[in-house]
A protein has these predicted regions:
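Long, polar/Ser/Thr-enriched low-complexity segments
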Residues: 78, 85, 132-138
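Short coil/turn segments at secondary-structure boundaries
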Residues: 53-62, 121-132, 187, 191, ...
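Intrinsic-disorder/low-complexity regions
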Residues: 3-4, 129, 134, 140, ...
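A well-ordered secondary-structure block
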Residues: 27-31, 133-215
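N-terminal targeting leaders of exported, membrane, and organelle-targeted proteins
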Residues: 2-116, 196-197, 203-269
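Secretory-pathway/luminal and periplasmic proteins that interact with or process carbohydrate-rich
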Residues: 110-128, 137-139, 198-200
Length: 269
């Protein structure tokens, strides 16, 4: 059985409230809701469900020696990961994010650096805190890795195979965030109201079967950008797949407005 360890990401200028609750059975769909259901069902059906392993995830495998190379991911893995990210953004009414090559390279350097030091599943993996730079990784690449790993990180133990969607969905659901129940930092990055782009990286441990996945989505210009929505709720206020809300999945409300008093939460169907 696969075991996923998730790390909470650093999130700026967003106020987040998380709480646990049981899914609510939906009432009868209106015509517009039924149309939305069919739209999201068709869109999900078209998402690639392919499994990737150490042999198929790379176009070029990393080289953990001189000369260091972070490797190059299979383009299909990158595009599928972004398809899932943008599917989940669409569910809550957010625009799609771009996937520029420079962000992918930074994310891949981050993932390969985690793999090079066989990083343990702990919060110190963010920014590679207390990890020594291998002598075959340049100071410049190490600096890029430190920044890229401040974003979303997923550790998949004994990863003989995994799909791109499996990684993104784990980060979205936040069922097993090692920072503690109720932490929704990964979800907040995926569903950011300011984000415009994301880089994707992944690498198997140099001497383990741990799969390190990096979603590099923290950029200074995005953080300073005006939000496209003032609030995000999970599950979404409109139709929402019940598969994304398990018994351990924290529900959440995120807003760009500061909340100074104890809020009251009402759940209505």
């Amino acid at each position: 059985m696969k075991k996923h360890n998730l790390l909470v990401a650093i999130v700026a200028v967003v106020e987040c409230i998380a709480f646990t609750a049981q899914p609510v059975q939906a009432a009868k769909y209106s015509k517009s809701e039924a149309k939305q259901v069919k739209y999201f069902q068709r869109k999900y059906k078209n998402l690639d469900k392919a499994q990737y392993n150490r042999n198929s995830i790379y176009q070029q495998a990393p080289n953990f020696a001189n000369p260091f190379s972070p490797g190059v991911l299979n383009p299909a893995y990158i595009s599928t990961t972004m398809d899932y990210v943008n599917y989940y953004r669409d569910l809550v009414g957010l625009p799609s994010e771009a996937n520029p090559d420079d962000a992918n390279r930074s994310a891949q350097i981050g993932a390969a650096s985690l793999a090079a030091v066989n990083a343990s599943a702990s919060l110190q993996a963010h920014g590679l805190i207390n990890y020594l730079r291998p002598n075959y990784i340049s100071e410049n690449d190490w600096g890029i890795a430190e920044n890229a790993t401040l974003g979303n990180i997923n550790f998949l133990d004994d990863a003989h195979s995994a799909s791109a969607g499996e990684i993104v969905t784990d980060l979205m659901r936040e069922d097993n965030n090692i920072a503690g129940a109720g932490n929704i930092g990964h979800r907040a990055i995926i569903l950011s109201t300011r984000a415009t782009r994301m880089g994707i990286g992944a690498a198997y441990g140099m001497s383990t079967d741990m799969l390190y996945s990096v979603e590099y989505g923290l950029f200074a210009d995005d953080i300073l950008r005006a939000p496209v929505k003032s609030r995000i709720v999970y599950p979404a206020a409109k139709v929402f797949p019940y598969e994304l809300v398990g018994k351990d999945t924290p529900w959440s409300y995120s807003t760009t407005k500061r909340i100074s008093s104890k809020p009251k939460i009402y759940i209505m169907d």
